[in-house]
C-alpha cells in the first residue's frame, strides 16, 4: 500500500526516540518549541511590514495638507506597525519642542523593540543548547558502550550505546541547523524595521507648525512673549469665535512648548484650539 512507507518512517522515528532515551525527548521538545516560536515571530514581522514606509509617509503628507495633524492621525490609525506608531506619537505632540518629541518617540521605540525581539533570546538559547544536549547523549552512549565492554562483552549492549550516542548527536545538530537560518532571517527582518524607524525619527522633524490658540484677557503681552522666543516665526491676533492668536513656529527650535512659554512669561494659560504640522 502507498501508506506503508509513511507508516515505516514514523515507526523508525518512534524507535529512534525509544532507543535514544530521555535526552532525545528533551531535544525534540525544545526543538518543536523553538520552531513554533520562530514561525510566530516570522508571521508577526511579515504582518508589521505589510505596508511600506513610503506608503505611510505619502498618506501622512497628503492628510496634513488637507486637515493637519488630526487628519493625518486618522489616516495612519489603520496601520498598526512600529513606523505608524512612531509617526502618530510625533503628530500628537509635534507642536512641542524637539526634546519632548524625541523623548515620546523613544518611548514608543522601546515598546516596539520589545515586541519585535520578544522570544529571540529563547530561540538563540535553544540553538546553543540543543547540540550540547546531543553531546550529553553522546557521552551517555559511550558510557553504555564501555560498560558493555566488561568482563563478559555484550555486543548488543555495545550496539545500543553507540546507537544512543549517534541518535542524540544527530538530533541535537538537526535542531540547531534548522533553527539557525530562521533565527538569522528573523534578526535580519528586525534590523530592517529598526532602520525604517530610525529614518522615520529623523523625518518627523517637522519644518514648521501653525497653531490657533485662545488666551483670556489682553493678548498683547502674549504676542510679545511669543515673538521674543526662539523658534517662533510669526504671531498675529485674530478675531475668531474659538481663537484669538495664531502662531507659526519651528518645533525643532523651541526650547519650551508654546503653552509653557505663555504660562511662564505672562502668567496665563492658553487653550490650544488647533495645531497643524508641515514638512
From Swiss-Prot:
Matching InterPro entries: ExbB/TolQ_transport, MotA_ExbB_proton_chnl
Subcellular location: Cell membrane
GO cellular component terms given for this protein: plasma membrane
Membrane protein topology class: Multi-pass membrane protein
Entry keywords, A to Z: Cell membrane, Membrane, Protein transport, Transmembrane, Transmembrane helix, Transport
Coiled-coil residue windows: none
Record's keyword annotation contains Transmembrane: yes
Pfam families found in the cross-reference section: MotA_ExbB
Signal peptide interval: none
Single Gene Ontology BP annotation: protein import
Transmembrane region(s): 19-39, 126-146, 162-182
Record keyword Transmembrane present: yes
Family: Belongs to the ExbB/TolQ family.
PANTHER family tied to this protein: BIOPOLYMER TRANSPORT PROTEIN EXBB (PTHR30625:SF15), PROTEIN TOLQ (PTHR30625)
Protein's name in the database: Putative biopolymer transport protein ExbB homolog
The organism of origin for this protein: Methanothermobacter thermautotrophicus (strain ATCC 29096 / DSM 1053 / JCM 10044 / NBRC 100330 / Delta H)
Amino acid at each position: 500500500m502507498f501508506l506503508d512507507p509513511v507508516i515505516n518512517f514514523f515507526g523508525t522515528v518512534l524507535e529512534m526516540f525509544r532507543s535514544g532515551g530521555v535526552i532525545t525527548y528533551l531535544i525534540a521538545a525544545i526543538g518543536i518549541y523553538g520552531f513554533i516560536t520562530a514561525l510566530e515571530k516570522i508571521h508577526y514581522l511579515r504582518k508589521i511590514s505589510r505596508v511600506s514606509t513610503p506608503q505611510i509617509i505619502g498618506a501622512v503628507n497628503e492628510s496634513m495638507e488637507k486637515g493637519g495633524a488630526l487628519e493625518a492621525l486618522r489616516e495612519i490609525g489603520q496601520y498598526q506597525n512600529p513606523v505608524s506608531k512612531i509617526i502618530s506619537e510625533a503628530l500628537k505632540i509635534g507642536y512641542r519642542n524637539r526634546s519632548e518629541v524625541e523623548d515620546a518617540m523613544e518611548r514608543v521605540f522601546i515598546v516596539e523593540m520589545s515586541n519585535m525581539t520578544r522570544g529571540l533570546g529563547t530561540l538563540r538559547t535553544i540553538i546553543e543548547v540543543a547540540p550540547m544536549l546531543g553531546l550529553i547523549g553522546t557521552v551517555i552512549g559511550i558510557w553504555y558502550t564501555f560498560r558493555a565492554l566488561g568482563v563478559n562483552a555484550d555486543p548488543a549492549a555495545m550496539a545500543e550505546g553507540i546507537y544512543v550516542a549517534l541518535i542524540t548527536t544527530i538530533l541535537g545538530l538537526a535542531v540547531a541547523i534548522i533553527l539557525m537560518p530562521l533565527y538569522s532571517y528573523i534578526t535580519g527582518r528586525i534590523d530592517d524595521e529598526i532602520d525604517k524607524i530610525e529614518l522615520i525619527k529623523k523625518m518627523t522633524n517637522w519644518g514648521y507648525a501653525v497653531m490657533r490658540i485662545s488666551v483670556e484677557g489682553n493678548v498683547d503681552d502674549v504676542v510679545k512673549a511669543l515673538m521674543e522666543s526662539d523658534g517662533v516665526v510669526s504671531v498675529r491676533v485674530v478675531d475668531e469665535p474659538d481663537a484669538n492668536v495664531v502662531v507659526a513656529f519651528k518645533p525643532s527650535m523651541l526650547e519650551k512648548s508654546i503653552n509653557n512659554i505663555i504660562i511662564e512669561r505672562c502668567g496665563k494659560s492658553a487653550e490650544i484650539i488647533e495645531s497643524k504640522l508641515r514638512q
